[in-house]
């Protein structure tokens, strides 16, 4: 059976050749897509557009990431999800709120990091950005210092923007085996090991250039999902489109 990454790569190639609205036929086992073909068959019976199939697979990947235990861990052990907000994108905003809800539904205890007061207007100012990173990481160390990481069967980091840098740095510093959901990561995020990570980026994000993020993600073997014309909040400015993005991210 093909991996999610292999299926998504095939879909991207087919979308370039035939268009996103081209109809294909998917093979599913227990509502999980396992393959697809261009013509219906005994195994591939569900008609679906390439775009819809891509979005369904992305959602499946996210569910798999959230629901699974860490390899080799005690499946009866508790699970912990830690939320790392952005500077202005707090934990009660849509991407973090709904992902946390999803994690909670799958049995994770939710913990949110608070950075305290950080420098403002950091975009385009490397000195302020480094200061914000150092302060946020220091507060993260204090906030999470009492956690016995070995007591959890699965650890999930849910992060946004500068939070993706903080979460990746923290996991690396403490040699933690974690799964990470990286919403709108910065280039600096990819300075750290990202095994077990999945990333989401908008092609109109003014904080991170798409080609650069694509290359960096490929270097780290981190699955990257692009939302066309979406900004740093993965929003497009069109309400109906933004609701659709939330449903499929």
Give the role of each language-model region.
Residues 15-41, 47:
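Acidic, low-complexity, intrinsically disordered interaction modules
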Residues 48, 57-151:
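Serine-hydrolase catalytic machinery in alpha/beta-hydrolase-like enzymes
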Residues 158-167:
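Gly/Ala-rich beta-loop-alpha elbow adjacent to hydrolase catalytic centers
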Residues 176-185:
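A conserved short beta-strand
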Residues 199-201, 205:
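Short beta-strand/loop motif that positions the catalytic acidic residue
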Residues 206-212:
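Conserved alpha/beta-hydrolase "acid-adjacent" motif
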Residues 230-244:
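Catalytic histidine-centered segment of alpha/beta-hydrolase-like enzymes
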């Amino acid at each position: 059976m093909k991996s999610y990454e292999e299926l998504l790569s095939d879909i991207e190639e087919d979308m370039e050749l035939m268009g996103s609205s081209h109809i294909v036929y998917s093979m599913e086992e227990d509502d999980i897509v396992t393959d697809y073909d261009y013509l219906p068959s005994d195994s591939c019976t569900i008609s679906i557009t390439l775009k819809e199939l891509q979005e369904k697979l992305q959602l499946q990947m996210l569910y798999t990431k959230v629901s699974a235990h860490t390899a080799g861990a005690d499946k009866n052990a508790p699970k912990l999800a830690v939320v790392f907000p952005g500077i202005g994108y707090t934990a009660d905003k849509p991407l973090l709120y709904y992902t946390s809800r999803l994690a909670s539904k799958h049995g994770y205890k939710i913990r949110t990091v608070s950075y305290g007061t950080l420098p403002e207007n950091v975009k385009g100012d490397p000195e302020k950005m480094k200061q914000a990173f150092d302060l946020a990481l220091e507060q993260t160390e204090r906030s999470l210092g009492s956690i016995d990481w070995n007591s959890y069967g699965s650890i999930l980091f849910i992060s946004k923007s500068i939070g993706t840098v903080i979460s990746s740095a923290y996991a690396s510093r403490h040699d933690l085996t974690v799964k990470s959901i990286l919403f709108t990561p910065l280039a600096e995020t990819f300075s750290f090991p990202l095994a077990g990570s999945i990333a989401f980026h908008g092609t109109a994000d003014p904080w991170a250039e798409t080609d650069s993020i694509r290359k960096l993600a490929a270097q780290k073997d981190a699955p990257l999902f692009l939302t066309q014309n979406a900004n740093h909040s993965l929003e497009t400015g069109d309400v109906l489109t933004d609701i659709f993005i939330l449903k499929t991210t």
